[in-house]
């Protein structure tokens, strides 16, 4: 049995698991493992962004694109505390990475050394991470590392993915023990649970009784890589498909059966189909408030009058918000395959049966298109939001990976963007973390070096993490940041106008008391960092500027001035209790 230092064991294990990157920042608490990483630098690359939260967002986005985990590394105290946001973001959206944090040495536990959390328990950092990771491990000796590493890797990627924390006292990196590398993990994607025969038969019976079915697909569909099967099922039966943001791309956004997102900022056809359906087959979504119009009957859904088949790999999500008529614990890909295979057992389940319903849905699609399309050609300055989305849809290639930060721009993309491929539209949906898109796009680029990676980010979100330009220049990452510059925290400013009669305070950026709107020159900022920078204030310049940025194959910021006073047309609702909710701007609720 070889004698190894703890840091060597961790580095060798990551190499064995074919982890290509470790994102993190040095500190006195992890310097002991850096030497071990030096020895494997040709197989495991350390990339140091300028903030730990950014490291986590990069790792999160890497997994969303490639469905293979990487690792992060942080030092004791503040460095590791900065991981809370990115772990919460990943956990909320079922994304996985190995979060290695460092802690004070075991010989100093409970003595209040530099950066120890000790008020309730010695070296208590694992309790900080507990709510934001799938599991936390705290091996305090080198001989505890093999088991902890294997369990951490398996826990992270099996079932519903999630980040896992490995919190290590920094003496363990340098101490030695007689240890073996743990065996390689073979669990990732190896076990896909399916439905039992009775559940498949019941799902068929519900389909046979339905006249107006819809599919509602979410991140569980993306994680199981079920796009091909879902598209086949939808096409075979002529069933329209509603998507959550993290399910977008599983069926092409421009497919005739794709209705888009649902909820307040969803598309009108999706809300109309959702609230009028007599059967909803839900594949890997949890019906959060934004995709259910805050659970108000008739705005997006009409449960329990509408029958519900709820399929999810995580039993905790079945019935969380709506009690299903049939709850199925299964991998989405396996379940849809089972359903397709069993369809011949029920001859009455056919596209002909649902054709009148589909014709009705197509009418809603035509109405919505007639309502929104004229604004996609509006040539105004500052640029109209629909024009920006439409231009990017036209000039960006089908294989683009789009990373979206939180902000009002995200609402516009939810409503109108048509993702052409799965795992290509990255959102912080569950936790809505500002900075995710700004930082995550670099992780996406590392996961898919041959594909264009573009982040659309707000001016507020970008100024939370402007240091990303340094990392992109250092590592020659040709990512493009499109800054949606409306001189405001636009999403919250819109709430003030919609719910508080426009009593604007604290939601826009002004220079002193002059009333002059203020932001830095983002393009000059980019150039100062060694990246390319452009400013777009005229609509006729946007398309060519984006195309040039992609052609240059260099880090680039495009500062786009967007009209802050044009708001997405709501087609559902969303409530901030106890404030009364608003009626849709387009369409009306329908209560079955």
What residue ranges belong to the model's regions?
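Internal, active-site/partner-interface "lid" segment
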Residues: 145, 348-369
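Active-site diphosphate/adenylate-binding microenvironment
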Residues: 7-11, 15-19, 33-38, 362-444
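Thiamine diphosphate
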Residues: 108-120, 271-276, 320-321, 327-329, ...
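Short beta-strand segments
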Residues: 167, 403-405, 559
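Conserved short loop/turn motifs at secondary-structure junctions
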Residues: 218-223, 377-378, 458-460
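A short, charged, Gly/Pro-tolerant segment at domain boundaries
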Residues: 165-174, 357-366, 563-566, 574-575
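N-terminal alpha/beta PP-like core and its mobile active-site loop of ThDP/TPP-dependent enzymes
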Residues: 1-353, 391, 395-398, 471, ...
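Generic enzyme active-site microenvironment
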Residues: 310, 403, 456-457
């Amino acid at each position: 049995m070889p004698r190894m230092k703890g840091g060597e064991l961790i580095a060798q294990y990551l190499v064995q698991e074919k982890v290509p990157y470790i994102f993190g920042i040095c500190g006195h608490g992890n310097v002991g493992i850096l030497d071990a990483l030096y020895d494997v630098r040709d197989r495991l690359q350390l990339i140091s962004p300028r903030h730990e939260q950014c490291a986590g967002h990069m790792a999160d986005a890497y997994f969303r694109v490639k469905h293979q985990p990487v690792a992060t590394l942080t030092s004791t105290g503040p460095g590791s505390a900065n991981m809370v946001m990115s772990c919460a973001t990943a956990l909320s959206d079922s994304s996985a990475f190995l979060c290695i944090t460092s802690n004070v040495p075991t010989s100093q536990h409970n003595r209040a050394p530099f950066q120890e959390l000790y008020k309730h328990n010695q070296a208590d950092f694992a309790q900080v991470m507990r709510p934001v990771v799938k599991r936390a491990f705290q091996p305090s000796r080198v001989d505890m590392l093999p088991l902890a590493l294997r369990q951490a890797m398996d826990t992270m990627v099996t079932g519903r993915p999630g980040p896992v924390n490995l919190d290590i006292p920094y003496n363990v990196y340098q101490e030695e023990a007689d240890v073996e590398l743990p065996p390689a993990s073979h669990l990732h994607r190896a076990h896909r649970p399916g439905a039992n025969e009775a559940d498949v038969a019941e799902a068929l019976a519900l389909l046979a009784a339905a006249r107006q079915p819809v599919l509602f697909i979410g991140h569980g569909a993306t994680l199981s890589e079920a796009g091909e099967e879902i598209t086949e099922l939808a096409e075979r039966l002529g069933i329209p498909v509603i998507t959550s943001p993290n399910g977008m791309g599983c069926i092409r956004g421009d497919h005739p059966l794709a209705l888009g997102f649902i909820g307040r900022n969803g598309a009108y056809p999706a809300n109309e189909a959702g609230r009028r359906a007599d059967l909803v087959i839900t594949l890997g979504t949890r019906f959060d408030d934004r995709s259910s119009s805050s659970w108000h009957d008739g705005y997006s859904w009409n449960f329990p009058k509408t029958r519900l088949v709820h399929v999810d790999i995580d039993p905790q999500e079945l019935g969380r918000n709506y009690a299903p008529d049939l709850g199925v614990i299964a991998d989405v890909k396996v379940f849809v395959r089972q359903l397709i295979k069993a369809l011949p057992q029920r001859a009455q389940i056919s596209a002909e049966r649902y054709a009148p319903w589909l014709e009705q849905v197509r009418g809603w699609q035509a109405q919505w298109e007639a309502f929104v399309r004229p604004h996609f050609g509006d040539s105004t300055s500052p640029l109209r939001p629909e024009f920006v989305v439409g231009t990017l849809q036209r000039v960006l290639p089908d294989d683009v990976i789009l990373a979206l930060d939180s902000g009002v721009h995200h609402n516009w993309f939810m409503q109108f963007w048509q993702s052409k491929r799965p795992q290509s539209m990255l959102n912080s949906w569950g936790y809505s973390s500002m900075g995710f898109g700004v930082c995550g796009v670099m992780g996406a680029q590392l996961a898919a070096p041959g594909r264009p990676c573009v982040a659309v980010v707000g001016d507020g979100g970008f100024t939370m993490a402007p240091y990303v330009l340094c990392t992109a220049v250092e590592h020659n990452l040709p990512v493009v940041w499109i800054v949606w510059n409306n001189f405001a925290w636009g999403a919250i400013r819109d709430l003030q106008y919609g719910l508080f009669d426009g009593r604007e305070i604290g939601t826009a950026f002004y220079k002193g008391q002059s009333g002059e709107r203020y932001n830095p020159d983002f393009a000059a900022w980019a150039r100062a960092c060694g990246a390319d920078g452009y400013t777009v204030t005229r609509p006729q310049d946007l398309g060519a500027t984006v195309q040039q940025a992609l052609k240059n194959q260099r880090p680039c910021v495009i500062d786009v001035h967007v009209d802050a006073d044009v708001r997405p047309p709501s087609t559902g609702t969303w409530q901030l209790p106890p404030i009364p909710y608003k009626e849709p701007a387009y369409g009306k609720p329908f209560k079955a």
